[in-house]
Amino acid sequence: SITGKEVVLGGSSKLLAKSDRSGGKILVGGDWQGKEGTRQAVFTTVEKGALVDASADKVGDGGTVVVWSDIKNPKSKTIAQGKFLAKGGSTRGDGGKIETSGYYLLTHGIKTSVKSMNGKSGEWLLDPYNITIGSSASGTAFNDNDPGNDTYTSSATSEVLASDISSALENGHVTIQTGGSAGDGNGDGDIIVSASISKSGGGDKTLTLKAHNDVTINSSISSSSSDLDLVLWSDSDANGSGGVNLNSNLSTNGGNVWLGGGSGSASWQSLTVGNGNS
């Protein structure tokens, strides 16, 4: 693991935790969901061109990659713009898991793969405070200066490109979740889709949007290649204030669609969904 208050991996950096039989575990700025007692960074940056790879080469499951900063600290940020891999073995083995999380999160141009050639796909998890899935960078959350010199806008919303989500869905499942119980209270834990997400390759995949408050779909979500299961999960604290606002088309190419809420989880059509009203 690599951690500290400020962690920066430059564009020529390579972190590898690979073997013929399994992928390893690479932690940058913290552990999965901030657990296991690993120190949590405040500023974590993985620049474009950097490679973080915890794949299995031949047999076995892909490993774990985490790029993290403290999601409970309103001044924390994660910039993840490199290439992140946790693929299953080429002969057999399931895909691994990748997490990129921070109170503010910027992932423009990120490349991820948790695919498996002969097993189950893995998952890419994004866990910021508020997030907009858009078509371009607005720069509202933070600038790209060195970590110690950045300026912050406490009410800013994290950003991920719809094109990056579209590409990632060809190589694994994607989960975006938000939390509104921590931080400075200037965000509600919303997820807003403001640019179209279109899966055009790969096998059956799942896109889960799980918001502490609202999930708002203002642009289409579609698949033209295999099934795309959609889980649109609002009000994950079950306080009754969140909902799913569907203002555009969903086209799943035969996949399932679940809309609802709940603070706990349930199983429906082999998907993990909320245990509230749906």
Predicted regions and their residues:
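Extracellular and secretory-pathway beta-repeat/beta-biased strand scaffolds
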Residues: 1-278
